[in-house]
Amino acid sequence: MVARLVGLSERIESVAFSPDGSMLAVTGGLPGRMGEVQVWDVAKRSLKISVPVTYDTLYGAAWSPDNTLISFGCSDNTLRAIRVRDGKQVLLMGGHNDWVLDSVFSRDGKQVISVGRDMTAKHTEVESERLIDNLTSITPGALKGGIAAVAGHPTKDEVLVGGSDGQPQVFRLKRQTARKIGDNANLVRKFPRMPGRIWDVSFDPAGKQAAAVSSLNGDGMVTIYSSDYDSGIPDDIKKIFNKTPNGGEKQKLEGYWAREVSELHSIEMPGVEIFCLAFSPDGRILAVAGADGTVRFIEVASGKVTREAVAVKIEGEVIADSVSEGEKRRLNRKRGKRAEISERTISPNEISALVLDPAEIVLTKPNHYAQILVTARLKTGGRVDVTRQVFTEVSGGLAAITERGQVKPLRDGEGVLAARIGGIKVEARLKVTNVHSAFAPDYVRDVKPVISR
C-alpha cells in the first residue's frame, strides 16, 4: 500500500485518476445524508477540495481531457459537473428518470455521456448544459434494465455501455440517419451476452479490444472481446434505419450489429462478484477486483490470471467486533438491528397528560402497519416523545406493537389500543379487517418501489 486517503465519506462509489495522473477524483458520501466529490493531490497525498452535493451518495466520476472538470451522477436523477479549481458547478442536466450511475466525457471534452437506472444513455453539451439526445433507443424492450457503466472509445466518437441485460453495446455520439420512431440507429455493435449484471466496461488504449465484468448468484465473470470493427453504416443498413423494419430486416440489423466483434476470453470467478476493471497503459494486462478485496491481473492475450494482490492486508484473524461473548450488543445505528433505549426516562410525576397520534388506527390488509407516536405533556410546559417508554396493550389481541411503536394486525375486529405511563393513560380506536385475505401484490404499488433496475 502506498497511501490511505481519508475523507468524510462513509461510502466510496467511484475513483478516477486525472488524465495527467496528478489528481484523483472520488465520489461517494454519507448514504441518505450527503453526497461528496473529493479531489486529491496524488504526489502530496493531500485533499485539494471537497464539494458536498445533494443528499445521497454520488456515482460515476469522470475527468475532462484537460483536467479541469469532473462529471458525476446523482441519485436525484441529475448529471452534474464541477470545476476542479474552485468546486463551482458548471453542469446540471435533469433529463434522467432514475439514478445516474456513470458518466464519461467525449474526446474533445465538450459533451458528457451519462447512463443510469432509467435504461438510457444520454448525451449532454457541457457549455450550454443542454441535453442533446438519447443515444439508446426509446423503443420499449430495446434495453432490458438499467445501465451501470459507460466508457469512451479512445479513437472514435463512440461509447461502450453495459448494465442489467448483460450485453455490452457500442453507441455512436453523432447520428448519421434521420430519426425514426422506434429506430436504434445510434447502435454500432452488440457484443456477445455474458451472465448476470454488468458492473464495469472498458476499451483498451488502442480501442482494438474491450472488456466487461459481471456477477450472478455470488459468482463473477470477466469477458474480453475483440472490438476491431468498421463503424461505417452500409447503404442497405441505412435504408432499413430510414423506415420501420420488417421481420427479415430486423434479422439483418442483428447480423450487422454482431459483425466483426467476438468473445476472446471468458474468465469465471467462482464465489466472488467482480465489480470493476482497468486496462494497463500498454493494453497487455487487465486488472479486475470484486467483493473479496483481491485485485487479479489477467494477461489479455491468454486470458490467464497471472497475479493476485490483496488491496488491504488484514493481520491476524480478529473479527471487527469488540463485543465479547455474553455481553449485550450495542445498538447498530447503521442497520438498526436492536432498539436499545438510552434516552432519559420520564417519571409519571412529571407528566400532566399523554397524547397518542393517530387517534384512530385502521388496518385493512394483512401487510398493513401503522406507526404510533406518544407524546407526554410535561407539567413544566414542555413536550417529550415517550413512544419507546410507554406500556401498550391492545384489546382482544387484535394487533402487535413493537418497542418503537409499530402496529401490525393479528386478527379482525374492533377495539382499543392503550398506552400508559404509571397511572396516566391514553387510548386510540383500532379497527382491523381482512387479515386472512389472500395478498395479491401489485407490481407498481408493491414491487417496483423496492427493486432496482
Identify the meaning behind each predicted range.
Residues M1-K334:
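WD40-repeat beta-propeller superdomains and closely related acidic/aromatic-rich repeat-like regions
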